[in-house]
């Protein structure tokens, strides 16, 4: 069992100020076999590379700030309190166009986070 306290992740200081920080927070050491989890911390002006997952499904829980999620070329505004499901195969990215941090918790199948991550080149979008 692992308890995730949102206020702890909202208050967490970014160890790489001005840069994206995405540590894994749910690992096999927590007895997680089919799920993984990570904190996404996107400072103002940062963007996750446009990508997709062949097998992974994700639930993203936005916990502070606001941003844009682009899924298959369509923009969706997101903010604290929003929850997003992304099925396997959908190309997506998260962008922070605001002046403050955007933070989210992401829980996903097929861990670890790097195992099923395929960046989409500009000409493939």
Predicted features and spans:
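A short, N-terminal "cap"/entry segment at the start of jelly-roll beta-barrel domains
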Residues: 1-35, 117-125
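A short beta-loop-beta micro-motif enriched in histidine and acidic residues
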Residues: 25-36, 46-59, 72, 80
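Short acidic-glycine-tyrosine-enriched beta hairpin
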Residues: 73-88
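Short beta-strand His + acidic residue motifs that chelate non-heme Fe in jelly-roll/DSBH
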Residues: 50, 69-70, 86, 92-98
């Amino acid at each position: 069992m692992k308890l995730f306290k949102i206020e702890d992740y909202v208050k967490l200081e970014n160890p790489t100020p001005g840069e994206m920080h995405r540590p894994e927070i749910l690992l096999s050491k927590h007895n997680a076999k089919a799920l993984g989890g990570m904190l996404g911390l996107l400072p103002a002006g940062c963007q996750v590379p446009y990508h997709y997952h062949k097998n992974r499904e994700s639930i993203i829980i936005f916990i502070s700030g606001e941003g844009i999620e682009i899924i298959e070329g369509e923009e969706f505004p997101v903010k604290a309190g929003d929850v997003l499901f992304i099925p396997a195969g959908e190309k997506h990215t998260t962008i922070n166009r605001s002046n403050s941090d955007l933070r989210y918790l992401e829980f996903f199948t097929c861990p670890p986070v790097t195992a099923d991550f395929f960046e989409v080149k500009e000409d493939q979008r």
